[in-house]
């Protein structure tokens, strides 16, 4: 399909064009072919035309760290710090999950993400073959990561490699994968060494939690006399490209390790606040030119998958933490939620900008809303004024997924019904 979005404000996230006050975007198949100021003067025959008047186009948002299947546990285990929350609530009930549960939960997550402009998500969970199915059925870009933890790590690593082989054969263009060891405190040294070697051998990126809480840092320090970053460096995890979630408790040397290895940091401000884990020193990492992107974490610790909320929280929290209103601008937050996320997760595809030859993942926001007027600074409006309900068009991989707030190929009512029935099965048994 070829799509023309005309009469639209365009936030390109590209330094050369930045914001186009009124222009057009031409999409052919899965790529952006033209982005220009003014009117499209070419032949409009056979084009699917979207009138963008009163709307703003942004690159599709990239949720760089989540656990989509955990929508089941939204609001479950409230009011506990991370370690108690995991040990007393989450891990025991997760043992009851089956593949079909994760599929239905991920369907709900996909709806929630698409509705608020997220077109790509980086997942770490169980039964990831079900997540593959959902990504393809719902036409959302998915980075698939089998969660590797505990004594079953060898089986889980094999599962990750097997899924990666299938993804490489997939023709949808929507899928990639990462090797996803859960964390340094849920895996042995031997396991992490083996995972590091396998990731390097397979040329796969790694997705891992690092230094989320002070408890984690203390556990690793007591066991290995190293910080989590120092320990992971010693076992070879950083020999591959790494996307590190949280990174709340880092020493100066830890930040140097991340910088030297080209590691991307995934900032999860709402989850870190809700679990009282702490505040990551994001502004300092940005000053060091560490690539910082943004994630929601799972709904059980957030409790939503709204990247627009995450941008606002993320920037306000840094301003407050440093007591400096100049820290982490709205434009930088949007970059973290788009291009920086794509840069962290995807190696050989152009994603995260509205620019010629980039993948056509685009969201349109309706600016004709009380909370979106006036438009003195469009980046500020998107980050501080929007709440996600303004998203009324979503395009993923060159296909229109949502039009005027309605899903084109997804039976939303069926998804909601199936999810509610599945929750009865989980919580009543």
From Swiss-Prot:
GO molecular function: 5'-methylthioadenosine deaminase activity; metal ion binding; S-adenosylhomocysteine deaminase activity
Residue numbers binding Zn(2+): 65, 67, 209, 297
Domain of life: Bacteria
UniProt keyword list: Hydrolase, Metal-binding, Zinc
Entry's EC annotation: 3.5.4.28, 3.5.4.31
Catalytic activity annotation: S-adenosyl-L-homocysteine + H2O + H(+) = S-inosyl-L-homocysteine + NH4(+); S-methyl-5'-thioadenosine + H2O + H(+) = S-methyl-5'-thioinosine + NH4(+)
Annotated residues for binding of substrate: 94, 182, 212, 297
Cited Pfam families: Amidohydro_1
Cofactor binding comment, as recorded: Binds 1 zinc ion per subunit.
Requisite cofactors: Zn(2+)
InterPro entries with a match to the protein in the record: Amidohydro-rel, Deaminase_MtaD/DadD, Metal-dep_hydrolase_composite, Metal_Hydrolase, MTA/SAH_deaminase
HAMAP family named in the record: MTA_SAH_deamin
UniProt similarity note: Belongs to the metallo-dependent hydrolases superfamily. MTA/SAH deaminase family.
Task performed by this protein: Catalyzes the deamination of 5-methylthioadenosine and S-adenosyl-L-homocysteine into 5-methylthioinosine and S-inosyl-L-homocysteine, respectively. Is also able to deaminate adenosine.
Official protein name in the record: 5-methylthioadenosine/S-adenosylhomocysteine deaminase
Species annotation: Clostridium tetani (strain Massachusetts / E88)
Gene, per the UniProt record: mtaD
């Amino acid at each position: 399909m070829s799509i023309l979005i005309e009469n639209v404000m365009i936030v390109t996230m590209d330094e050369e064009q930045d914001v186009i006050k009124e222009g057009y975007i031409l999409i052919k198949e899965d790529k952006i072919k033209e982005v220009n100021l003014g009117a499209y003067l070419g032949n409009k025959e056979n084009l699917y035309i979207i009138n963008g008047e009163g709307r703003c186009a942004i690159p599709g948002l990239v949720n760089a760290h989540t656990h989509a299947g955990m929508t089941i546990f939204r609001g479950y285990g409230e009011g506990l710090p991370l370690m108690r929350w995991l040990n007393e609530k989450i891990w025991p009930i997760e043992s009851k999950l089956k593949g079909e549960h994760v599929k239905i939960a991920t369907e709900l997550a996909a709806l929630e993400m698409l509705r608020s402009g997220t077109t790509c998500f980086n997942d770490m969970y169980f039964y990831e073959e079900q997540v593959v199915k959902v990504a393809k059925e719902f036409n959302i870009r998915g980075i698939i990561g089998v969660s590797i933890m505990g004594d079953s790590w060898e089986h889980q690593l094999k599962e990750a490699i097997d899924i990666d082989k299938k993804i490489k054969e997939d023709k949808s263009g929507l899928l990639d994968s990462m090797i996803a060891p859960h964390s340094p405190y849920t895996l042995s040294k031997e396991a992490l060494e083996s995972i590091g070697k396998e990731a390097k051998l397979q040329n796969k990126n790694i997705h891992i939690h690092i230094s989320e809480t002070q408890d984690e840092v203390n556990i690793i320090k007591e066991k290995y006399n190293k910080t989590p970053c120092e320990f992971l460096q010693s076992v070879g995890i950083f020999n591959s490209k790494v996307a590190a979630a949280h990174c709340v408790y880092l020493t100066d040397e830890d930040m140097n390790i991340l910088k030297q290895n080209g590691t991307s940091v995934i900032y999860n401000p709402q989850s870190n606040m809700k679990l009282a884990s702490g505040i990551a020193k994001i502004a300092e990492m940005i000053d060091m030119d560490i690539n910082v992107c943004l994630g929601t974490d799972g709904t059980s610790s957030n409790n939503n998958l709204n990247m627009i909320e995450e941008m606002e929280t993320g920037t306000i929290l840094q301003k407050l933490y440093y007591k400096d209103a100049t820290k982490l601008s709205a434009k930088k937050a949007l970059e973290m939620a788009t291009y920086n996320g794509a840069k962290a997760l995807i190696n050989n595809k152009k994603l995260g900008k509205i620019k010629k030859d980039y993948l056509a993942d685009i969201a349109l926001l309706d600016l004709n809303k009380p909370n979106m007027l006036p438009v003195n600074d469009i980046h500020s409006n998107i980050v501080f004024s929007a709440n996600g309900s303004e998203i009324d068009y979503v395009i993923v991989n060159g296909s229109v997924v949502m039009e005027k707030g309605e899903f084109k190929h997804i039976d939303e009512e069926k998804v909601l019904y199936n999810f509610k029935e599945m929750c009865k099965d989980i919580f009543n048994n």
